[in-house]
Amino acid sequence: MKNITDSFLCLGYWPSAGSFGFNTDILATNPINLSVVLGVLVFFGKGVLSDLLDNRKQKILRTIRNSEELREGAIEQLEKAQARLRKVETEADRFRVNGYSEIEREKLNLINSIYTTLEQLENYKNEAIHFEQQRVINQVRQRVLQQALQGALGTLKSCLNNELHLRTVSANIGMFGTMKEKITD
């Protein structure tokens, strides 16, 4: 390496013979200066450039790893959210089906209750009609009996004397009282 450096120094002492030679002015441009500057840059800059590229590579790899981790986390969260969504949809379907079946059950219960109420009302109506018929029949019987008694009394009055008349009336009143007790019971 010393020989190379010495040779470059020797070049610097050569008298300039025109346009070719070693120029000590770093800003001057000629092929030798350019090759020396490039050689120095490559020799010393290779480590710095390598370190910069390695640092950049590490940052990129870290960013990629972080992105992969975030992506995996996002995929995991998405899967969890999809599982929760499926669960909620299943529960919603179950509630919907149960709700419809509950509505149908309530509807059937209401219809059955209405039929039961209608049957009870029909029974009450029939009982009321039967009771009213019995009452009317009893009233008709009483009127018929009263008219028959009045007719019999009229016939008896015309045919019987006072004593016989009183006995017949007493017997009829007793019989009428017995019938009246049976009717009112």
Curated annotation (Swiss-Prot):
UniProt-listed InterPro entries: ATP_synth_b/b'su_bac/chlpt
Topology versus the membrane: Single-pass membrane protein
UniProt superkingdom: Eukaryota
Gene Ontology MF terms in the entry: ATP binding; proton-transporting ATP synthase activity, rotational mechanism
Keywords: ATP synthesis, ATP-binding, CF(0), Chloroplast, Hydrogen ion transport, Ion transport, Membrane, Nucleotide-binding, Plastid, Thylakoid, Transmembrane, Transmembrane helix, Transport
Transmembrane portions of the chain: 27-49
GO cellular component entries: chloroplast thylakoid membrane; proton-transporting ATP synthase complex
Location(s) in or outside the cell: Plastid, Chloroplast thylakoid membrane
Family as reported in the entry's similarity comment: Belongs to the ATPase B chain family.
Subunit note: F-type ATPases have 2 components, F(1) - the catalytic core - and F(0) - the membrane proton channel. F(1) has five subunits: alpha(3), beta(3), gamma(1), delta(1), epsilon(1). F(0) has four main subunits: a(1), b(1), b'(1) and c(10-14). The alpha and beta chains form an alternating ring which encloses part of the gamma chain. F(1) is attached to F(0) by a central stalk formed by the gamma and epsilon chains, while a peripheral stalk is formed by the delta, b and b' chains.
UniProt miscellaneous comment: In plastids the F-type ATPase is also known as CF(1)CF(0).
Function of the molecule: F(1)F(0) ATP synthase produces ATP from ADP in the presence of a proton or sodium gradient. F-type ATPases consist of two structural domains, F(1) containing the extramembraneous catalytic core and F(0) containing the membrane proton channel, linked together by a central stalk and a peripheral stalk. During catalysis, ATP synthesis in the catalytic domain of F(1) is coupled via a rotary mechanism of the central stalk subunits to proton translocation.
UniProt protein name: ATP synthase subunit b, chloroplastic
Organism: Glycine max
Gene that produces this protein: atpF
